[in-house]
Amino acid sequence: MNRVDTRPPERRTQTISDGELGALVEGRHRDPFAILGPHRDGDTLIVRACVPGAHSVMLADSRGEPLAPMTPLHAGGVFTGRLPAGVSVYQLLVRWHNGTQQVSHDPYAFGLLLGELDLHLIAEGRHFELGACLGAQWRNVDGVQGVRFAVWAPNARRVSVIGDFNGWQPARHPMRLRHPSGVWELFIPEAMGARPGCRYKFDLLDPHDAQLPDKADPLALATEAPPATASVVTQPQVSAPPFAWQDDEWMRLRNAVDPYAAPLSIYEVHVGSWLRAANDPARGWEVLADRLIPYVHELGFTHIELLPVTEHPFGGSWGYQPLSLYAPTARLGPPQAFAAFIDRCHRDGIGVILDWVPAHFPTDPHGLARFDGTALYEHEDPREGFHQDWNTLIYNLGRNEVRGFLLAGALHWLEHFHVDGLRVDAVASMLYRDYSRAPDQWVPNRFGGRENLEAVAFLRELNTVVHERCPGALTIAEESTAWPGVTASAASGGLGFDFKWNMGWMHDTLRYLSLDPIHRAWHHQDMTFGTVYAWSEAFVLPLSHDEVVHGKGSMLRKCPGDDWQRFAGLRAYYGFMWAHPGKKLLFMGGELAQWQEWNHDAELDWALLDHPMHRGVHTLVRDLNALYRELPALHELDHSPAGFQWVVGDDHQNSVFAWLRRPAPGSGDVVLAVTNMTPVPRYGYRIGVPSEGCWHERLNTDAACYGGSNLGNGGAVTAEPVPSHGQEASVLLTLPPLATVILQHAGTQA
């Protein structure tokens, strides 16, 4: 075994005081390597070991054969012995009171574990492989297999690793502090029980020698299923055996796609309540792979967006209060099963986006809160570090190590799990120091302003690093204010996201949808205002989980009128949305037209598919996705004003909207979309179009197959050379009640 010898010579042979021995067995000694392990004494090595509960300990050779006895130094389990001259490689042969024995290499015989470059990058916040550096790493060190534990806790007086392998006794495995990085490290051989599958935590003393709650590993790659809170040793990464990726073709093609010109239709999913049978730590991801992936494929969505799957203690947070930012929740299975789920999505042509939460974290005592007895990950001042709305703590993004922890965590999902994008949660709460705070409850930035400059710098760095290291991966911001340049490049002063949720469009149009049709004439602008700023950012139109909880009502319940009008209004609204500029997002259950709000403790009301009206909405969503993907006009120029033109935007008396969608020049036909948001059919309604000839009725939300009255235009209309609405030609349409009709011009490309 090769060792790096770092102990000062004068420390090796002096007598160990009773006070130091007592501190060692009580788990209070700050420098265990100064006492434990091999220490040179002339031509031989003195070895000390702390093995509480042992009957006896002997020094053994590499085969486990006894070399020399060890005698007790302290009743708490400290033993000492001398190796024969010329012998430096040894093992500890421990006999327990129950008659069993254990032979293992000594954790305190190994030299420094982490390299100086690793520690330097950690301190700079630029170690982008942090998940393979800190935490519990299944490694071979000097020919010995075991687990290398490392944790950042610069202000702790002592850190021990505790777990299944040592009876959860802090005195067994105190760790070495690496100055000045504040990282503690220790290698525990497999022969001592440290191996994949074993549970562990860190036991810490704060700067004043006070005991802290046992802490889960911030860099854990796997965890116990809640309510249990321990971290779990796992294989090094999912990119290594036993999992083999089969999505090379997907990853290659993804990197070549222009996300702004491509269709992007997202099905947002809370996995625990999509199907209750998936809540199985043994095979949850397998169940979802068998059920969710074919379902999404049938409906034609391009991507699945998962509410946070990072491990979180409280299920009622829906994942938005995570503690283990590197571990997929154990509620659904091990990390390899999650990787297999993503791999299968890719092989079926479906991308995967994860909701990711870098804004805040919960106060659970086993988590990041006052991790080493100080405000390590959070701000010390509660005006900066405590979020009053959610009773959570706010990351201190001005600290290099915290920023690096989050950056590496984002890359962990993109690089090691092949995730296709991150939807960053609660960006607005990060950008403003006074977000949801009273005037005297926030701290201005160094210029006296309300902008959180550290958060701005972090988000720019996040997007820059993601786009440099993960070509084709998307970043999407949930940002609810008018912060400028969210999707502008970081180099030009923007934040650098690929897309931003259009919360304004969502709020305006849902408010309009909830009105009785007789009142809609006075709120016409709610449906048109979105196009005033539609190209100021690259937008996703989100009908998310937040809009169907907390008394807001399901999508169907938002619609006024009798049952027929509710279904018709919802179908018309979906048609309006899919034909409107912007990428699409629909939360699960919206395609079923559920009556009830989303309940995270239940599952979707799948029995609704046995009812024709609900099945009709389901079929409509499928057909909208198919048409959206087929027609370039509906997606290619989503983020350019050249792709959109109002034809009828001011008919508030009839609540009719009509607009043209155009593709990139030469790539497809012009599309006309018309929405009638009253229950009154409109016959002979003239609408201007840019070209004469045949306009095919590609989709009518009032079709009988969707549960409608089947009023329409017989599949096609012919444009006449009658100018109207500033266009050279026009069509006379029958507008069904509460319906959207989408027509495609035949033969003349944009």
Swiss-Prot record:
GO cellular component annotations of the record: cytosol
Any one GO molecular-function label of the UniProt entry: hydrolase activity, hydrolyzing O-glycosyl compounds
InterPro entries with a match to the protein in the record: A-amylase/branching_C, Branching_enzy, GlgB, GlgB_N, GlgB_N_E_set_prok, Glyco_hydro_13_cat_dom, Glyco_hydro_13_N, Glyco_hydro_b
Catalysed transformations (reactions): Transfers a segment of a (1->4)-alpha-D-glucan chain to a primary hydroxy group in a similar glucan chain
Alphabetized UniProt keyword annotations: Carbohydrate metabolism, Glycogen biosynthesis, Glycogen metabolism, Glycosyltransferase, Transferase
GO biological process: glycogen biosynthetic process
Group of enzyme by EC: transferase
Pfam family for this entry, one: GlgB_N
EC number: 2.4.1.18
Gene3D superfamilies (alphabetical): Glycosidases, Golgi alpha-mannosidase II, Immunoglobulins
Family, as annotated: Belongs to the glycosyl hydrolase 13 family. GlgB subfamily.
NCBIfam families the record matches: branching_enzym, PRK05402.1, PRK12313.1
Function in brief: Catalyzes the formation of the alpha-1,6-glucosidic linkages in glycogen by scission of a 1,4-alpha-linked oligosaccharide from growing alpha-1,4-glucan chains and the subsequent attachment of the oligosaccharide to the alpha-1,6 position.
The name this protein goes by in its record: 1,4-alpha-glucan branching enzyme GlgB
Organism of derivation: Cupriavidus pinatubonensis (strain JMP 134 / LMG 1197) (Cupriavidus necator (strain JMP 134))
Lineage: Bacteria, Pseudomonadati, Pseudomonadota, Betaproteobacteria, Burkholderiales
